[in-house]
Design a protein with these regions (language model features):
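Phosphate-binding site of ATP-dependent enzymes
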Residues: 173, 202-256, 305, 309-324, ...
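ATP-dependent carboxylate/phosphate-activation module, predominantly the ATP-grasp catalytic core
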Residues: 235-292, 325-326, 330, 345-368
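Glycine-rich phosphate-binding loop of ATP-grasp-fold ATP-dependent ligases
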Residues: 175-205, 232, 254-272
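Peripheral (often C-terminal) accessory segments that flank ATP-dependent C-N-forming ligase machineries
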Residues: 326-329, 363-402
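Conserved N-proximal alpha/beta basic substrate-recognition cap immediately N-terminal to
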Residues: 44-56, 65-167
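Short, positively charged and aromatic/hydrophobic N-terminal segments
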Residues: 3, 9-16
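Flexible, glycine/charged-enriched surface loops at secondary-structure junctions
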Residues: 296-306, 368-375
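N-terminal-proximal low-complexity accessory segments that begin disordered
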Residues: 18-56
Length: 402
């Protein structure tokens, strides 16, 4: 039997209503690891402007937390009027009132961190619906680049001394130095051995490394590869199993996310075939599942992704796996290699959004899907607000997602 709430326009049923939250500041909150964390202005605005996007994957009758209901309804209608009737947008004051009826089933954020838990506690979300601090500490550990270096990467070293960082850079020639937790290119430095050879010391960089080691315990150092294409594999932990959801073909500008290809999985595999075989992709996928499933089964349920890279493979690129031909032979005719783990995103990703948006558009026979088999999903900033937009077209060699 449905229970009426004055803030909702339809009846809600026991054990079916979920609360969805878009908290894109998650990676920064992981780094801070505080119960009360204030994201930079850009992060807060992104959260407010795109708070509606969980409507793309939420189920019938679910709640989506937003700052402004009318604004969210106006934004989501561009992706189909049916989304406004499928979910209920709700503000924090309304959420507090709703909890008095105690019919909320579960909470599904973009990513779990200590700051979000504190925010939800202040909203009155029952403790039983929130992860324990011990579980959050484990999620934070698996989210770190240190964990990825130990379990899924080759040629990446976690370093706790500045002198060793310099030694590795001189060894690699060109290297990427990363903080264990960071977001959208922050906490990532590209360094050349030449920077040290010409100046002897590199005080600005060394201060940055020392600061990262002091605040986060260390940094990772890896060789700098000559990138050909970014891509990712998206997964979901459900009932203790890691399930594959699909490929993500995305682009970055200055190391910050800029867009995703919107098309079927078959089409994405076809786009990748000139670079890597379907069989090799399947092998990488199974290796990731083999590592992540046992690591996550007792601590995490929800989406996650693994970023990867196709690169040119030189003789010195010993840690970059050779791309195999269709028969699985390492003939290295293409001169390409694959890095099967750049980093782990233990949260929902824009790749998941692209998969869900494409499925929604196909299911509702949108004009975009009828006119263009392949589209581009972009997050754009117009100087005032962030927008999630669909643009016709497909990537090219000259402009992968432009």
């Amino acid at each position: 039997m449905g229970i009426f709430c004055p803030f909702l326009r339809f009846s809600l049923y026991l054990c079916t209503m979920k609360l969805h939250i878009f908290n894109p500041e998650h990676d920064l909150a992981l780094a801070a690891n505080l119960k009360q964390f204030t994201a930079p202005h850009a992060g807060r605005q992104l959260r407010s402007d795109l708070a509606f996007i969980p409507a793309l994957w939420a189920e019938e009758g679910d709640l989506v937390l937003v700052d402004d209901i009318d604004f969210a309804k106006n934004r989501v209608r561009h992706f189909g009027a049916e989304l406004n009737s499928k979910v209920e947008f709700i503000t924090k004051p309304q959420q507090k009132h709703l909890l008095k009826t105690e019919f909320l089933d579960s909470v599904h954020p973009w990513g779990w961190n200590l700051s979000l838990k504190g925010e939800l506690e202040r909203l009155g979300i029952p403790e039983i619906m929130l992860p324990t601090d011990a579980v959050l500490n484990k999620v934070r550990e698996v989210s770190s680049r240190q964990w990825a270096a130990l379990h899924l990467q080759r040629g990446v070293e976690y370093v706790t001394e500045t002198a060793r960082v310099k030694e590795l850079i001189l060894q690699h020639g060109k290297a990427v130095v990363k903080a264990p937790w960071s977001s959208s290119g922050r906490g990532v430095k590209y360094v050349s051995a030449e920077d040290f050879r010409t100046a002897g010391d590199y005080p600005t960089f060394e201060r940055w490394v020392a600061n990262m080691i002091y605040h986060q315990g260390g940094v990772t150092v890896e060789p700098l590869y000559n990138k050909v294409r970014d891509f990712a594999m998206e997964f979901e932990m459900k009932d203790g199993k890691a399930l594959y959801r699909g490929l993500s073909l995305f682009d970055t500008i200055k190391n910050a996310y800029s867009g995703n290809v919107l098309c079927s999985e078959d089409d994405k595999v076809e786009m990748m075939k000139p670079l890597i075989s379907e069989a090799q992709l399947a092998g990488i996928r199974q290796r990731i599942i083999g590592v992540m499933e046992p690591a996550l089964k007792d601590i995490y349920s929800g989406p996650f992704g693994v970023d990867m890279m196709i690169c040119t493979k030189g003789e010195k690129d010993e840690f970059c796996e050779a791309v195999l031909n269709q028969e699985g032979e390492d003939v290295n005719r293409t001169g390409l290699g694959v890095v099967p783990c750049i980093e782990i995103n233990l949260r929902r990703t824009m790749g998941h959004v692209a998969i869900d948006l494409y499925e929604h558009l196909v299911a509702n026979s949108s004009d975009e899907m009828k006119t263009n088999r392949t589209n581009i999903m972009r997050v754009e900033y117009d100087g005032n607000r962030y927008h999630l937009r669909i643009k016709p077209g497909r990537p090219s060699e000259e402009a992968p997602l432009h």
